[in-house]
C-alpha cells in the first residue's frame, strides 16, 4: 500500500513539473517569438466577441422582472492614512489608494483624485459606447478614450473627451452612437447636473497632548504638522525667488518630475491613448474597463447580474468613493494651512441608485446616483466649532465636491483609427 501511495505521489509530482515546464516554454515563446505572439493575439477574444456577450448580458438583465429589482444603497469609505497622508478608499471588497505626485507633496502611490474621477467618467462613457453599439448592432474592432479638463475653475471643469474607434459603421451611425452613449451613461448624466451633498460632522475631542508608549509610530497629527512646516518653508522660498529644495522639509521631493510617463499601450487601443492624461479602454476578454493615468491603472467593472465579473467597483461607486477621497485630501491641506491638528479623518458616504430606471413605470427615475450623504469623522484637540469651520472650508476648496454640486459641460468627438491587431 505504501509503495502504491509513494508511486502515486511521484507520478503526480512528475506531471506537475511537466506542466510547469510546458507553461514556462509557452511563456518564453510568447516573449521571444514575435510570430507566436501575434498569432496568440489574433486568437484572443475580439471586440466583436465582447459586443455579443454584452448584448446577451443586457437582454438577460432586461428579462429580470421589474418587481424583482430594488433600489441599491451605494456605500463607500475613505480614510486619511495616518503618517503617509494617502487616501485609502474601500467600496465593498474593492479598494484603492489615491495620492499626489511628488511635486504636490505626495508619494505617487496612486492616481490623484481629480485625474481619477475624470478617468472614471471616461470609463463609464466608453462602457456606454460598448453597450449601445451592442444593442444597435454596430461592429467595433477597437475602442479607447482620452479625456481632459479644460475649465477655468473648481466650479467649471469643462471636460472634453475623444473616442478613438475602429468600426465599419458610417459617420452618421457613429454620431448616433455618441448621442446614445451620452444619454445612457450614468456618470455623464450625473455630471451635467448639479447635486446636493448632505454633509454631517461626527466630532470627537482628542487629548491636547498625545501620551503613547515608546513604540508609537507617527500618525495623522504628525503628518499635518509636517505639511504645515513644508508649506511655510515653500512659501518663504517662493517669496525669496528660490525653488524649494528636495533635501528639506522631511525629504520633500519637489525637484522630482511629476512621475514617469506610461510606456504601456494596450494591444487593441495602440498609442493614440495619451501616456500622461486620463484615459480608459475596455479589455475584450473580460469586458472590464481599465482606467489609466500615467503608470497607474484601476479597474471598473459591472456586477455579475449585469454581465460583469465584479473585478472592480462600478463607475458610479468609484465616483462616490472619490468624493470622499478628495474631501479627505483637501481637509488635510486645510488643516495644515490653518495649523489645526487632526488625529483621525474618515469619510463615510452613501448614495441611492435604482436599476429600474427607464423601465415601464420608472421612466422618470434617474439612471444616476441620488441622495448623496457624507459623514465626516474627525477627532482633534481643537473645539468642535473650529472643526466645523474646517469642514466648510474643505467643501469650498474640494475639487470633486464642486464637480458634484455644479452642473458641468462635457463635450465629445469621435476619431477613427485602425486596430493594431488587424
Where are the regions a protein language model picked out?
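Gram-negative bacterial Sec-dependent N-terminal signal peptides
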Residues: 2-20
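Short, intrinsically disordered low-complexity segments
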Residues: 1-2, 25
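Alpha-helical metal-binding/catalytic segments enriched in His/Glu/Asp
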Residues: 120-126, 323-327
Amino acid at each position: 500500500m505504501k509503495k502504491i501511495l509513494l508511486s502515486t505521489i511521484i507520478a503526480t509530482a512528475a506531471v506537475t513539473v511537466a506542466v510547469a515546464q510546458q507553461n514556462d516554454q509557452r511563456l518564453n515563446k510568447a516573449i521571444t517569438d514575435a510570430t507566436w505572439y501575434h498569432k496568440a493575439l489574433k486568437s484572443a477574444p475580439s471586440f466583436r466577441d465582447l459586443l455579443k456577450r454584452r448584448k446577451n448580458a443586457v437582454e438577460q438583465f432586461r428579462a429580470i422582472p421589474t418587481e424583482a429589482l430594488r433600489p441599491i444603497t451605494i456605500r463607500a469609505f475613505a480614510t486619511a492614512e495616518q503618517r503617509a497622508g494617502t487616501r485609502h478608499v474601500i467600496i465593498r471588497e474593492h479598494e484603492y489608494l489615491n495620492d499626489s505626485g511628488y511635486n504636490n507633496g505626495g508619494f505617487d502611490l496612486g492616481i490623484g483624485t481629480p485625474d481619477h474621477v475624470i478617468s472614471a467618467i471616461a470609463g463609464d462613457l466608453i462602457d456606454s459606447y460598448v453597450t449601445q453599439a451592442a444593442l444597435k448592432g454596430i461592429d467595433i474592432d477597437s475602442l479607447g478614450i482620452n479625456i481632459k479638463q479644460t475649465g477655468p475653475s473648481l466650479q467649471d471643469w469643462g471636460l472634453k473627451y475623444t473616442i478613438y474607434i475602429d468600426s465599419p459603421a458610417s459617420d452618421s451611425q457613429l454620431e448616433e452612437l455618441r448621442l446614445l452613449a451620452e444619454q445612457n451613461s450614468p456618470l455623464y448624466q450625473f455630471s451635467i447636473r448639479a447635486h446636493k451633498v448632505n454633509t454631517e460632522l461626527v466630532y470627537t475631542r482628542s487629548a491636547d497632548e498625545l501620551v503613547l508608549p515608546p513604540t508609537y509610530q507617527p500618525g495623522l497629527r504628525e503628518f499635518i504638522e509636517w505639511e504645515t512646516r513644508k508649506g511655510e518653508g515653500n512659501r518663504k522660498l517662493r517669496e525669496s525667488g528660490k525653488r524649494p529644495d528636495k533635501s528639506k522639509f522631511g525629504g520633500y521631493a519637489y525637484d522630482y518630475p511629476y512621475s514617469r510617463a506610461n510606456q504601456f499601450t494596450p494591444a487593441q487601443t495602440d498609442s493614440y491613448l495619451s501616456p500622461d492624461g486620463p484615459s480608459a479602454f475596455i479589455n475584450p476578454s473580460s469586458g472590464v474597463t481599465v482606467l489609466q493615468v500615467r503608470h497607474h491603472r484601476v479597474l471598473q467593472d459591472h456586477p455579475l447580474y449585469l454581465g460583469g465579473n465584479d473585478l472592480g467597483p462600478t463607475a458610479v461607486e468609484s465616483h462616490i468613493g472619490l468624493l470622499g477621497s478628495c474631501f479627505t485630501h483637501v481637509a488635510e491641506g486645510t488643516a495644515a494651512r490653518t495649523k489645526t491638528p487632526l488625529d483621525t479623518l474618515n469619510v463615510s458616504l452613501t448614495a441611492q441608485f435604482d436599476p429600474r430606471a427607464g423601465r415601464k413605470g420608472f421612466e422618470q427615475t434617474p439612471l444616476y446616483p441620488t441622495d448623496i450623504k457624507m459623514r465626516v469623522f474627525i477627532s482633534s484637540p481643537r473645539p468642535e466649532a473650529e472643526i466645523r469651520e474646517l469642514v466648510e472650508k474643505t467643501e469650498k476648496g474640494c475639487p470633486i465636491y464642486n464637480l458634484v454640486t455644479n452642473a458641468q459641460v462635457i463635450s465629445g468627438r469621435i476619431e477613427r483609427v485602425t486596430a493594431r491587431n488587424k
